[in-house]
Design a protein with these regions (language model features):
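Hydrophobic alpha-helical segments within soluble ligand-binding/sensing domains
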Residues: 49-71, 172-191
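Structured C-terminal subdomain patch of bacterial secreted/periplasmic proteins
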Residues: 169-232
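Single conserved hydrophobic/aromatic residue that forms the stacking wall/gate
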Residues: 1-8, 12
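An alpha-beta-alpha
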Residues: 57-102, 106, 196-216
Length: 232
């Protein structure tokens, strides 16, 4: 409650703060709270928002299925919650659609951010034959391990290409900024209402970073068409 105690009128919180957000919201009814990826809206001043991350992971799966040589995709997963499991399923189904021999191997690290654990997980997956590394965690450690090992990888949440320029095929980008601007303006002008938002490629909340030229133009065209289809 340090932020609201300092007079902030609109507070945005990320994963891991669902129950604390609702607890504090009860004590500060005049403050608007926005919680990412949660589902509890116990008070009228609490809204939730999330992105259709599975749409982006569908694109990654298509790319991975085409780029792998070992047919093993390594996936570093944070927590076994619907958001993460949905992404694993979407990626695997998309990969198997273009390459039926695909197998997905998963390491659960039970954290959103821990470079040490993420590095160990990436290396363990590579040691098990994965030549494509994916992550639903937030550090750059996995892509850096992949770069060193000479395998493909995908960035998470932002463009991580500079950390692994040869390894990264692209990155999923979580672009919350238009939503934050829209909701902050609503809070300021008095039109803010409780809601649950779930946007994706169509709205731009999920986006893709530039593609690695190693993919080749034909694969890039396939992915761009698939992205259009998912956004329609």
């Amino acid at each position: 409650d340090g932020f609201v105690s300092r007079g902030l009128g609109d507070v945005y919180k990320r994963q891991g703060y669902m129950d604390p957000t609702n607890k504090v919201a009860k004590d500060f009814p005049n403050v608007k709270f926005e919680h990412a990826t949660g589902y509890k809206r116990e008070h009228s001043n609490v809204s939730t928002y999330s992105a259709r991350f599975y749409e982006g992971r569908t694109l990654l799966g298509h790319m991975a299925g085409k780029m792998t040589k070992t047919n093993v995709i390594g996936y570093i997963a944070s927590f076994p919650i619907p958001e993460v499991i949905r992404g694993i399923n979407a990626m695997t189904l998309a990969a198997q659609k273009v390459n039926p021999d695909i197998k997905t191997k998963i390491v659960w690290v039970f954290t959103w951010y821990d470079p040490g654990k993420e590095s160990e997980a990436a290396q363990a997956l590579i040691d098990q034959g994965a030549d494509v590394i994916m992550q639903h965690t937030d550090s750059t450690a996995p892509v850096q391990v992949a770069e060193k090992a000479g395998v493909w990888s995908f960035g998470q949440a932002s463009d991580m290409q500079r950390f692994a320029p040869k390894s990264i095929l692209t990155s999923i980008i979580d672009d919350w900024s238009p939503y934050y601007v829209e909701r902050s303006i609503a809070a300021r002008d008095g039109t803010w209402k409780q809601q649950d938002t779930w946007h994706g490629l169509k709205e731009g909340m999920v986006a893709m970073a530039p593609y690695n030229s190693a993919m080749g133009s034909d694969l890039v065209k396939e992915v761009e068409q698939l992205q259009k289809d998912l956004a329609s």
